[in-house]
Regions:
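N-terminal targeting segments with Sec-dependent signals, encompassing both cleavable signal peptides
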Residues: 1-171
Length: 171
């Protein structure tokens, strides 16, 4: 009787409700210095993009976001973009490998960002034939930086052709 009836009598259900307010930008800056793990990925992103894109703070925040959210495709794509700006195509490729599912994401912005970043990494590695379809896909989705990367790809092809001609002349 104790195990069958009394546990039923002592059953209590709790329901707790609370509102979690967002930090203001100024509060986020302060919290980011001391306890960035208390901030959401979006709050950290807003802080990162408030710095110049060539600054150490900008890149540092994207590195930190990746440390805190290592399995998030957006964190990996953004970290890859930061690494590409610093010329580290190999590290960017590793981030993009973690976000590989994003290329088929229903979110067109995420898929085009992935395609552009992967194409840019391949471009930096002089793998032009592999880079082109990815950059075209991103450009067709409306990504302006992909169009600029395609222009760079064509310049690089021209440079490679000139270099090959010079090599043939000197032989």
């Amino acid at each position: 009787m104790l195990t069958d009836i009394f546990p039923q009598l002592r059953h209590v259900d709790y329901q707790v409700r609370y509102d979690l307010r967002d930090y203001t930008f100024e509060e986020s800056l302060s919290v980011a210095e001391h306890a960035p793990e208390k901030l959401s990925q979006m709050e950290l992103y807003r802080i990162a993009v408030s710095y110049a894109s060539d600054s150490a703070r900008y890149h540092g925040f994207f590195d930190r976001i990746l440390e805190l959210y290592p399995d998030d495709p957006a964190a990996n794509i953004n970290a890859a973009a930061s690494l590409l700006q610093r010329g580290d195509a190999a590290a960017a490729e590793r981030c993009l490998d973690h976000a590989a599912g994003a290329i088929a994401a229903p979110d067109a912005a995420m898929a085009s960002a992935f395609a552009n970043n992967r194409g840019a990494a391949l471009l930096l590695e002089n793998r032009l034939d592999e880079a082109e379809p990815l950059l075209r896909r991103a450009a067709d989705a409306g990504r302006a930086e992909a169009r600029r990367n395609l222009e760079e790809l064509e310049r690089k092809r021209g440079d490679n052709a000139r270099l090959e001609r010079y090599r043939n002349i000197s032989q």
